[in-house]
Amino acid sequence: LLMNLAKYYAANPQEYSIGFICFAGEEAGLVGSHYFTENPLVSLKKVRFLLNTDLAGTGEEGITVVNATEYPREFSMLNAVNDEHKLLAKINPRGKAANSDHYFFSEKAVPAFFFYTLGGIKAYHDVFDKPETLPLNEHEDLFKLIIHFNKKLMGD
């Protein structure tokens, strides 16, 4: 998903900067994202919104959005985009949680959502969690949701 988004934005430049970053050490305690937020390459005050797409699997049953209750305006925008384009089955709100790389950004006052997909295979971080068993059924719709949400968020 991240590579497809990067490819899309490289081919479709925006009037604002979009950064893509991958972190290591999540399972060891969000080490990479914690380090980055303590030693940012750009001022965190310049980050308008962070989207974390960790756990972007099948999505047959929709997505859950961590920090939805922290940013109700943006969550409402996301739902409006989904309703307009009829992309995902549902979008569930969730509150603040220290469960992925968005967390330390949120703690530094950077607005952030963490999307994780629902449904599909049950393997998660075990020997059965392999690329060939992950069908990515809603990958395209999640991709479109992010593109449309970014446009709405940035006022396009």
Residue ranges and their predicted role:
Residues 24-123:
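Metal-dependent peptidase/peptidase-like ectodomains
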Residues 3-7, 34-37, 79, 143, ...:
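Predominant activation on well-ordered alpha-helical scaffold segments within soluble catalytic domains
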Residues 1, 41-45, 71-75, 134-138, ...:
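Short, surface-exposed linear patches
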Residues 6-13, 22, 40, 82-86, ...:
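Sec/Tat-exported extracytoplasmic proteins
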Residues 1-30, 146:
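Alpha-helical metal-binding/catalytic segments enriched in His/Glu/Asp
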Residues 5, 12-13, 40, 75, ...:
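Generic alpha-helical secondary structure signal
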Residues 7, 11, 18, 122-156:
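His/Asp/Glu-rich mid-to-C-terminal helical/loop segments that flank catalytic regions of hydrolases
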